[in-house]
């Protein structure tokens, strides 16, 4: 379901950092990294975010700049990384790849005609999370002693499962699909200035007079990352149809419509591949020297791009006591 459509249904409210202080947040690593990656590329020179051999390391700058926001508000992040891409999501991945390739061509044209503003905007659209980006991010998080969980499939689904089990307090993601995966509470806008936004699953269901299963059915009718929706159906129409007919199958029968792999899509949200075999530590004891050396020496990031962030991490971890006990 498109983010704009699902946002219309979600129960959202601004929440002060003080109100969630002391919490553990399962962060959708892919979602968080992508936002910092595109932002870093916009405001950082090429020399700062690529090595001499051309390897992109903007993610390391993003991690160092982004982590202090958690620590300064006494929040413990747990980064949940995606596993393999599900077969049903391959088409979306291909579409994103095509969009990136088109953006690369447009960026080159903008640079050729000297339009620096357009080139800068297009550059952010060309970003992708490579295996090197994932591995270097893991390397830095490990040196900072930030917990990492490897999901068998969708990171959002794994993060939601951890919240359902009570192992974490919130899921951290900008994606509204966390509602469909059953996350009780999602904290949004963790990469933005100002206070975050809290998304509440039970209030969403109550406000829309839906069960979670019916919310998933509404999403499938509108379209998700795993399927195309029914033409002409938006969230209001989908809710009305579900209220009238009860579930997805009855709506499809009544409208004489068909959604390919609808049963599998439904299962991916309601019974996704997740694991309960993980060890979660919430005591943060970063090796700052090792982290600095990894970023500056091993990956050639200019020290002046990250030193302020490292100082904030060091200060905030000690001040909040994250290195002792959460």
From Swiss-Prot:
A molecular function (GO) held by this record is: DNA binding
Cofactor(s) needed for function:
Mg(2+)
Annotated region I-domain: where? 118-246
What UniProt keywords are attached to this protein's entry? DNA damage, DNA repair, DNA replication, Endonuclease, Exonuclease, Hydrolase, Magnesium, Metal-binding, Nuclease
- Quick one: where's region N-domain? 1-100
**Cofactor: binding details:** Binds 2 magnesium ions per subunit. They probably participate in the reaction catalyzed by the enzyme. May bind an additional third magnesium ion after substrate binding.
Q: Which residues hold Mg(2+) 1?
A: 28, 82, 154, 156
Entry function: Structure-specific nuclease with 5'-flap endonuclease and 5'-3' exonuclease activities involved in DNA replication and repair. During DNA replication, cleaves the 5'-overhanging flap structure that is generated by displacement synthesis when DNA polymerase encounters the 5'-end of a downstream Okazaki fragment. Binds the unpaired 3'-DNA end and kinks the DNA to facilitate 5' cleavage specificity. Cleaves one nucleotide into the double-stranded DNA from the junction in flap DNA, leaving a nick for ligation. Also involved in the base excision repair (BER) pathway.
List residues binding Mg(2+) 2: 175, 177, 225
Tell me its EC number(s), please: 3.1.-.-
Q: Which PROSITE patterns match?
A: XPG_1 (PS00841)
* Organism encoding this protein: Haloquadratum walsbyi (strain DSM 16790 / HBSQ001)
Give the record's family classification: Belongs to the XPG/RAD2 endonuclease family. FEN1 subfamily.
Q: Give the multimer and partner information.
A: Interacts with PCNA. PCNA stimulates the nuclease activity without altering cleavage specificity.
Q: What is this protein called?
A: Flap endonuclease 1
User: Which ranges form a coiled coil?
Assistant: none
Keyword DNA damage tagged: yes
